[in-house]
Amino acid sequence: MEILPKYKPEEILAIIHTHPKGPAEPSINDLLMARHVLTNNKNTIHGVLAENDGKLQLIMYNYWTIDGSKLAKMLSRFLDNGVKPPREEKLKVAHAYVTNIEDFDVSKIPEIADHFALWRYYWLIDTSDLFVFDPSNIDIYKKLKEKALFIPTGRDEGWLVLGVDTSGAEPIVYKVKECKDKVTLRSTGHEFSPIIVEWCKEKPMCRVA
């Protein structure tokens, strides 16, 4: 099994993140007021870091529901000639999530931009095979970062592969599904197949962290 390279955005226009929660259709003005937008092209912006009433806010969009062509057109209009879209114009993005971040370290953007890094950051594996919110467990964070592959299959579910290496050993695979404040893991045994790996390689959001 080939270990996929870690995603590194080529261009930073604003800061991005993904998360399948929150209100729908944030305004294009959220983008225009942003300090940073992280993207590899104008069609794949996932979210912004903005300031509102003196507080830093991370506005995270779901990758799968962005209207890429409309977003590209709106951004081009603004970035190329400074024309600001009307306030009522909305991005057709489902599941935006807004959170205040007091001490956000911009230098960590490449880490956070990785889709699996998002899951690592908000949940960890504990002894009961659950992902539970707790970003403070550095040991598990590092272990997942070194030996895990996340394959998204929908807005709130995907495959989690542990023990990925080049030795040919059978990987440990879980089907992951978000459920309110935690993510349940169900071992899939031999359900994992090379077909999934090949499919994964073609997806921009699928990578080893």
UniProtKB/Swiss-Prot annotation:
GO terms for molecular function: metal ion binding; metallopeptidase activity. This is Uncharacterized protein ORF209. Keywords: Hydrolase, Metal-binding, Metalloprotease, Protease, Zinc. PROSITE patterns: MPN (PS50249). Residues 1-67 form the MPN domain. InterPro entries: JAB_dom_prok, MPN. A motif (JAMM motif) lies at residues 17-30. It comes from Acidianus two-tailed virus. It comes from the Viruses. Zn(2+) binds at H17, H19, D30. One of its GO terms (biological process) is proteolysis.
